[in-house]
Design a protein with these regions (language model features):
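Positively charged n-region of N-terminal signal peptides that target proteins for export
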Residues: 1-4, 471-473
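Signature for phosphate-centric chemistry
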Residues: 20-169, 173-448
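Cleavable C-terminal sorting propeptides in eukaryotic secreted/cell-surface proteins
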Residues: 450-473
Length: 473
């Protein structure tokens, strides 16, 4: 009897404890729904729509023109993250030591053996060096080949397989990742040995990078102490989440936010690089914890590129005018494709009023905004794209010209359109305030005021001097 009790106690100690602690296992999770919440580092294959094969068909209508704004495909991290590879290795070793040596794994919600072993075996890819920062990856190349192939399948009468420099217009920014994205897209459209060329890069690219030339936008600092994202990162929710993650990893103190965010970043990058495999670092986070991190990112981008600041809706004045002019013209080219960045795609959505919530996102409304429209995971994943297709409809009783907008292969359901199908005249009316404006002054409001400030100061000083002299007399 005594022997039985000892064995039972040993069994409970060894196995009962183990069973209790393995609550969530990323390696065994076949759904991994949280990978759809990786914001701007989400993999396109996970985010893209699945109903476009039905949505693009419009009875009695034929597609005539296509306009595409395409974010580059999956890329490598920034230099700052690449240079922290050694810190990731230190964190890996510390976590393994917590579990294998110090035995400080929590009694519940600990890493499962699969995730722990995978983390123990993880090594940084030393071929990724700082000089390769933000380069397009092989997966990023395939992202763009995939979107080109799919859109050409849907619209073969517009996206012709033969390249013609008057029929097609391509343009990209001055970066490796957008240049290579252009090459991947055109390789898929026309075959590998094609002669497609992009428009010459201007000295100042105010069409695709307007934010580079707008000082008031740059001065609208989203990183100051009182920004919503920084207030959120001082909240009980955020700090409790950091503590929970630290405990899950076996630490008996709360890790610094920068270390947890580094692990989260590499989790998202690695998952996007190899969609069909798992990033070992994603095992550090439970799905609810990812949701907390997702909101922090959405807050940041809401104020940096979205509806949180009025100036964001002005920045892409030129690209909106370009889209409307292209779709409204009967002249060539019939296809225009632009390859750019997150800032461009998100500010374009702000200019067009897409995915706009009735209430602003703030540090205090995390719970009530769980069903928000502004989710950068859905708006701006790697290879995110916004497509406008112009149709000519012969059987339409009133309006013969129609447009469908697609965001990442989902028809955009604007409340003034009919299940995604918009009357062209309504499109022109809705964006008339942008179409008829002077973008030089509209895109960057406040330039005049900023340039006038030194003058006004000089005038004030001059008047003060005059008054002083008069008083002396």
């Amino acid at each position: 009897m005594k022997f039985f009790m000892v064995v039972s106690a040993l069994f409970i100690t060894l196995f009962g404890h183990a069973l209790a602690q393995f609550d969530y296992c990323f390696g065994k999770d076949t759904e991994r729904s949280q990978t759809r919440q990786f914001t701007t580092k989400s993999a396109y294959q996970i985010i893209k729509g699945t109903n476009i094969d039905k949505q693009y068909l419009v009875p009695h209508c034929l597609p005539q023109k296509i306009w595409i704004f395409h974010r580059h495909g999956t890329r490598l991290p920034s230099r700052s993250i690449i240079e922290k590879a050694s810190r990731l290795e230190e964190l890996r070793d510390a976590i393994v030591k917590n579990y294998r040596v110090l035995r400080t794994a929590p009694s519940t919600n600990a890493l499962c053996q699969e995730d722990l072993i995978a983390l123990q075996m993880w090594k940084w890819n030393n071929s990724i060096t700082p000089d390769m920062e933000e380069y397009l990856t092989s997966q990023g190349y395939e992202d763009l080949r995939g979107t080109a192939r799919h859109y050409q399948k849907l619209y073969p009468s517009v996206l012709l397989k033969e390249y013609n420099n008057t029929y097609y217009l391509f343009r990209h920014t001055d970066t490796q990742r957008t240049t290579e994205s252009f090459k991947a897209f055109t390789d898929s459209l026309f075959g590998i040995h094609n002669d497609a060329v992009a428009e010459k890069l201007p000295e100042k690219d105010k069409l695709l990078r307007p934010y580079d030339y707008c000082e008031p936008w740059a001065a609208n600092n989203n990183d100051d102490e009182n920004s919503e994202v920084n207030k959120y990162k001082r909240s009980v929710l955020w700090n409790d989440t950091l503590m929970e993650i630290s405990t899950r990893l076996g630490f008996q103190y709360t890790l610094e936010s920068k270390d947890v965010e580094l692990m989260y970043d590499i989790c998202r990058y690695e998952q996007a690089w190899q969609v069909d495999r798992t990033s070992v670092w994603c095992g550090a986070f439970t799905p609810p914890q990812v949701t907390v991190f997702e909101y922090a990112e959405d807050l940041k981008y809401y104020y940096k590129f979205g509806y949180g600041s009025d100036i964001n809706a002005h920045l892409n004045c030129r690209i909106v005018q370009n889209m409307i002019e292209h779709l409204g013209s009967n002249a060539l080219p019939n296809v225009q494709v632009f390859f750019a960045h997150s800032a461009g795609l998100q500010t374009l959505m702000s200019a067009l009023g897409i995915n706009k919530d009735d209430r602003p996102l703030t540090a205090n409304n995390y719970q009530s905004m769980s069903e928000r429209k502004w989710k950068t995971s859905n708006i701006d994943p790697f290879a995110g794209n916004f497509v406008a297709v112009k149709y000519e409809c012969n059987n339409a009783p009133m309006e013969k010209e129609k447009v469908i907008f697609f965001l990442n292969q989902n028809a955009v359901d604007l409340d003034w359109c009919h299940v995604g199908l918009c009357n062209w005249s309504e499109v022109v009316q809705r964006y008339e305030h942008i179409i008829n404006t002077d973008c030089d002054s509209y895109y960057c409001p406040g330039v005049g005021a900023l340039s006038a400030k030194p003058i006004s100061i000089a005038v004030t000083l001059l008047m003060s001097a005059i008054i002083y002299l008069i008083n002396l007399i």
